Curated annotation (Swiss-Prot):
It holds the Pfam family Anticodon_1. A motif ('HIGH' region) lies at residues 47-57. Its EC number is 6.1.1.9. Belongs to the class-I aminoacyl-tRNA synthetase family. ValS type 1 subfamily. It comes from Chlamydia muridarum (strain MoPn / Nigg). This is Valine--tRNA ligase. Monomer. It is found in: Cytoplasm. It catalyses: tRNA(Val) + L-valine + ATP = L-valyl-tRNA(Val) + AMP + diphosphate. GO terms for molecular function: aminoacyl-tRNA deacylase activity; ATP binding; valine-tRNA ligase activity.
Amino acid sequence: MNEDQFPKAYDPKSSESGVYSFWERSGMFIADANSKKPAYSIVMPPPNVTGILHMGHALVNTLQDMLIRYKRMKGFEVCWVPGTDHAGIATQTVVERHLRSSLGKRRTDFSREEFLKHVWEWKEKSQNVILSQLRQLGCSCDWSRQRFTMDPEANRAVKKAFKVLFDKGVIYRGYYLVNWDPILQTALADDEVEYEEREGWLYYIRYPVVNSEEFITVATTRPETLLGDTAIAVSPEDERYSHLIGAKVIVPFVDREIPIIGDFSVDASFGTGAVKITPAHDKDDYRTGMNHRLPMINILTPTGEINENGGIFTGLAKESARENIITSLEALGLFVRKEAYSSRVGVSYRSGAIIEPYLSKQWFVSVDSFRESLREFVNSKEINLFPPEFIRNYLTWVNNLKDWCISRQLWWGHRIPVWHNKHDEEYVICFDGDGVPEEVAQDPESWYQDPDVLDTWFSSGLWPLTCFGWPEESADLRKFYPTSVLVTGHDILFFWVTRMVLMCSAMVDTKPFADVFLHGLIFGKSYKQYDDNGEWTYVSGDQKREYDKGKALPKNVVAKWEKLSKSKGNVIDPIEMIDMYGADAVRFTLCSCANRGEQIDLDYRLFEEYKNFVNKLWNGARFIFGHISELTSRDLEEGVNKDLLGLEDFYILDRFNELLALIDSHYNCYSFDKIAALAYDFFKNDLCSTYLEIIKPTLFGKQGNDEQRATKRKLLATLLVNILGVLHPIVPYITETLFQKIKTTLGVVGDGLGDAVTGHAVSMLRSEACMIAGYPQPIELSFPQGLRESFAIAEKLVYTIRNIRGEMQLDPRDLLQAFIISSEKKELLDACIPIMCALGGIKTIEQLSEAPKDCIFSLGVVEGIQVGVILPAEHLAKEHARLEKEKIRLENSIESLSKLLASEDFRTRANPNLVQAKEDALRNSRQELQSILDKIASL
């Protein structure tokens, strides 16, 4: 075998693009909606067209590709639909930032159409990069079915869904308190708001009671909102204020008289027991305002400034207004004090702006009619959540679900398909066709389309349907919907997963998927480096990489696992990793740590480890090729002579069957990390470190005959083909490369079927490619009774021999002689001898009835079986001298420690921990000395 046929080192860059082109060119990714095979389908969680793939995308798409490749090889008609998401807020924000930096212009400097042209250009560039990166990763998507959440098909589906819900009265519009992002100037849904604990102040303010000398004092975290106060509330049971219920107070600066009301929701122990009610700017106050029919006065502009209702403070940013109001209250004698106070503050998940409860006219989806079906899908196990620990989270969220605000004040997105009459705001037309409604076409001057767009999650909620052509009754929809599984991160269980269940079931009255696998979120190691002043910066780049790989940390550097963040320097670029280590190493790394919903700790060390495994796979296959290159496919078609199979052969075949059973069970419950661990362990330990080492003497002609050697070679070829099939879903590139080399080496497969051992390998080799070959099947063979127990004894005997060699410090390169003594199990021990010789470094092993008298040996016992290693004569004196030297060292140590511990002065003055440590050292030295004396006696 020369270097051209099989290079010594695997080079991912030289093979990956060619392998992928071969798959795609051959049409192997394309699904057939008319196939009679059982369907297996996945719709890709569409990456946002905001930029490029990150490590989370690499993880989720690796896991999906594993499932798709596994099921394809299992005989399913698989359909994996790729796509991208328009990501309304995120993409518009990125493009606005790009236009400011490149052209020096803001969105409002363009017309809506002009701005959207720039967004579409951005989308095309970003999408092309993303799809190229998915190909690099090895994703076997059906690119002929590629989708975008704002393509014409998606737009038709969105308009249809809106019309269906609108006609049912589920979609409604009205003035409600929404989560307002003053930076992006749009409403957000409740689950788009993140909450942070922040330090602030509690301000105490006095309100003068009308026609009275009294004042009522309230405590508030937001004094600027007093401009919109419409009541003061107290508990009806609070005797301090019961006489004031029904009275009125004057709101400073705006001179508005507002009532003091009694409301049982007031916590009398908070602050002063009296609270200001601002229904237009606080959710709790909004409910109180609705219950008491209070006016709702909005005091803010969409940008977060005080509007015309703010009197002398009009035009000020709310932070400036707060300072000015406090100063003015002090001047009026109405400010009492402030005290430190921490509270949970809502923050926009996109812009980071503090969310402002804001009274605004928005479109909503009423969720009450969906709540029961959302619960039932999961409770009845029609939809299975993995891991099941998330079921409780899901049900809690559904039980507390509030109406969904679906309108966004953006330009990029699906325009709300509603037209308003300019003369009568309540007169609207919802239209899901192309163009405009007929009534609008006849009198366009009297109508305008709603300027808002739909929440991104509205269109994403229809994704499983739109990917297969809904609302058309397509062949794809009939074959591949509902989908088999959704793979995504647990962080969007509520953002997206539940909305898909809601939207899809509302449209077609069935679930969108059978299973949902929620993977954990990726964390990276961040390193804080402190200077002499205690200031710190994050370490990044090559320095971080070295620390990840195990370089010792200096005393001024502290490591911590944290969510991936550019600012923390712990982001790992998946494409950079592919360039450095190859796609297979990246995929194996991600698969190996893809636990069920827990934190995923990822660092460069793991990529190094699995790059080494990929190299091990290449080197192991190269070794096997060196011994099967003379075989032909006809040799495998003939099968193997089962009478020539040894204990080690039955064992490796049995282990392979066990591997298949375990891997199948783990695929069924999405335990990707366990699949990776099993495949890794079988190839590295069972096949290479154990089986190959056992049969090397036979392969190299040092034992056995030609027929036995031929049997081993057939087994090696069979095992290699099968393990490539098992590994293919995880590491598709190298397995395909090796599979093609085997096909080339063995030649065209004929009509022979092989036998129980080689049959499936022969069948696989008839396939054009590994990715469309049948998945390996259990080898139906009559295995010897007690096989596993027998091999376990062989392993224990090998372990004992290795222990003896280690204790006697025998050169591992020296082939020694050994013997075994047992009154029974002779046949078993005969079968164990080749294994013991190969793995224990033994030249010959004899079965004896008693220990030999004419040699020196070291003895061990395993389950009543004595195993002795005969020691070389020249080793005896050397080992005896070494043991005597060690004996003297230990005796001196014992004498020294004994004297120290006998000293009363030491025992009374020394730290008790030190005394205990010395006592432990004395005890250990005595035990070591006894062991040395025993060894000397045995010599």
